[in-house]
C-alpha cells in the first residue's frame, strides 16, 4: 500500500535537509511525499500556531524542480494546512526535518522541528522528527554559506524509519538525532531526554543610541547522564532515538494527588 507522508521542517522550504529527506523517502519507499514547509526560517518557534493573522499557501519549485507548498507561517501551521487544505486527509506519517542542528533534551519544547511533529501526532498521524548534529554552531543558521552534507543523514533516517513500518507505532513522536559523521553502521541507541542541551547565556549589547539590547545564547553541554540523548550524540556519537509523548502529565500523578488533594 502506498504511504502518504507529509514532510515539513522549521528551516524553510528551500532547506537542503528537507530536500535530501524528500528524495530518499520518495526513491526508497512506495510513498507519496508532500512537502509543506515555512516560507521563512522558523527555528525556535516551538509548536506555535498563527491564530491572529491569515496564512497563505504558495505552490513553489524546490531546487530539484519538484513541487512543494510554502506556507507563510510556523511549522505547526504547515502541518494543519498540509492536512486540512493540501492533502485534505490525515497522512500515515508526518515527518519533520532534516533539521540543521540537533534537537536534544527538554529544550525540544522550543523546537519548531519537534513542534511540527507533535502537531502531526495531535491530528492522528504517526510522527517523526529528524535532526542532524552540527558542531559548528555558527553554521546552523547559515546553511547557504557552508555546504552541509545531508544525504548520509537521510539514509540513516531511512534505516530507522523502515523499522516502524510493519509494527504498531510505539509512541506519539519519535525524535531521531544523527551525529554529523554518522554512517549506516553507526549504532542506534534508544534514549531519554537530557535535562539541558545548552547552558543559558544572555549577551547585552549597546545600540548607536546608547540603549541596551540582548541576544539569548548558550554553549553546548557535553557532560550528561549516560542513557540520555545528549550523551548518546555528543559523547558516544550514536544515533539517538527518543520516544516522546504528547501527554506531559507528571509520571507519578497518584502520589501527587495523595499529597496535595487534601489542600484543595
Swiss-Prot record:
Function (record text):
Nucleotidase that shows phosphatase activity on nucleoside 5'-monophosphates.
Name this polypeptide is given: 5'-nucleotidase SurE
Q: What is its main location?
A: cytoplasm
Its required cofactor(s), as named, are: a divalent metal cation
Q: Where does a divalent metal cation bind?
A: 10-11, 43, 99
Q: Describe the family membership recorded for this protein in Swiss-Prot or TrEMBL.
A: Belongs to the SurE nucleotidase family.
Catalytic activity annotation: a ribonucleoside 5'-phosphate + H2O = a ribonucleoside + phosphate
One Pfam family name is SurE
List where in the cell it is found.
Cytoplasm
- Organism equals Methanococcus vannielii (strain ATCC 35089 / DSM 1224 / JCM 13029 / OCM 148 / SB)
Q: Name one GO cellular component term.
A: cytoplasm
